[in-house]
Amino acid sequence: MRNKFIEAFEAKQIEGKKIPEFRPGDTVRVAVEIKEGDKKRIQNFEGVVIAIKGQGAGKTFTVRKIGANNIGIERIFPLYSESIAGIEVVRKGKVRRAKLYYLRGKTGKKARIKERRD
């Protein structure tokens, strides 16, 4: 059981954020705001959501993409982070698991996810 004051604080943190609904298996494009000195720029990270963890303001999601030379790159993003400029769902995937860690061992066509039609 969580403290009601902590829940109220977290609800206030979450309040103003517009976040689309996505699930594991979906391909998302996350726009990350990067500060370099006094300049800011936005960098996109596109990949498959392989896990969603936590609840409230501490909720995180893991995105995996295949980079150069077929090297898998995974990033864990806090869902309500100030550094996330936006999240866009590119494609909805049809999977039967909540955690898709098995994709780490798959390459090429074996790592494909069917599209969800709904």
UniProtKB/Swiss-Prot annotation:
Keyword Ribosomal protein: yes
GO CC field: cytosolic large ribosomal subunit
Domain of life: Bacteria
Keyword Ribonucleoprotein: yes
Ranges in coiled-coil conformation: none
Entry-linked SUPFAM superfamilies: Translation proteins SH3-like domain
Any Pfam family hit: Ribosomal_L19
Record-level GO BP terms: translation
This protein's UniProt keywords: Ribonucleoprotein, Ribosomal protein
InterPro entries for the chain: Ribosomal_bL19 (IPR001857), Ribosomal_bL19_CS (IPR018257), Ribosomal_bL19_sf (IPR038657), Translation_prot_SH3-like_sf (IPR008991)
Entry's Gene Ontology molecular function annotations: structural constituent of ribosome
Similarity comment: Belongs to the bacterial ribosomal protein bL19 family.
PANTHER family membership: LARGE RIBOSOMAL SUBUNIT PROTEIN BL19M, RIBOSOMAL PROTEIN L19
Function in brief: This protein is located at the 30S-50S ribosomal subunit interface and may play a role in the structure and function of the aminoacyl-tRNA binding site.
Name of the protein described by the UniProt record: Large ribosomal subunit protein bL19
